[in-house]
Amino acid sequence: MSKDYQKTEEQFRSAMAECRALFAKKLHDYGPSWRILRPSSLTDQLFIKAKRIRSLEIKKESLVGEGIRPEFIALINYGIVGLIQLEMGFADTPDISADEALAIYDKKADEALQLMIRKNHDYDEAWRSMRVSSYTDFILTKIQRVKEIEDIHGATLVSEGIDANYMDIINYAVFGLIKLS
C-alpha cells in the first residue's frame, strides 16, 4: 500500500472515529430513536443536511452558528443509519439496545471503509484534487437518486440500489470532513 493510500485510510478512520463518538453520545441521550424513521423520512433528513451545506457554501454565512463540518458528520451518521434501516427495516418503537446499535454501526462503517479503499485504489486519490463543493453536489445527486429509486419502489433497470448510494454519500462526506480538518 502506498503512503498516500495509507494516509487516506488513517484519515478516514480518524474521521469515522469522530462520527462514531458523536453517534454514541446521541445514543446515550436519545437511544436508537432513529429506528422509527421510514426510508423517505431518512432520505429527507439526508437532504436537509446536504442542502444546508450547499446553502452555507454559497452564502458564506451561518445565522445559527454551526458550520459545515457538523453537517458532514450528520450525513455520515445518517448514511450509516440508512444502511442499518435498509437491513433491518423501520420499527414502530426502538427495538435494539444502544450496544446493538453501535455494533451494527461499526459493521456498516467498516463496509464503507472497505469500499473507499477499493475505490481509492481505482481512482488513484482523485478525491484529494476535488473541491468540497463537488462532494456536496455529488451527495445531493445521490440523495436525488435515492428519492427516485424510492418512488419506483426499488425497481431499477440498470442502476445500483439505495445501499450503494448511501455508501457513496458516506464516503463523499468523509472526504469533505477530511478536507475541512
Task: Identify the function of each model-found stretch.
Residues M1-S181:
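Intrinsically disordered, low-complexity regulatory regions
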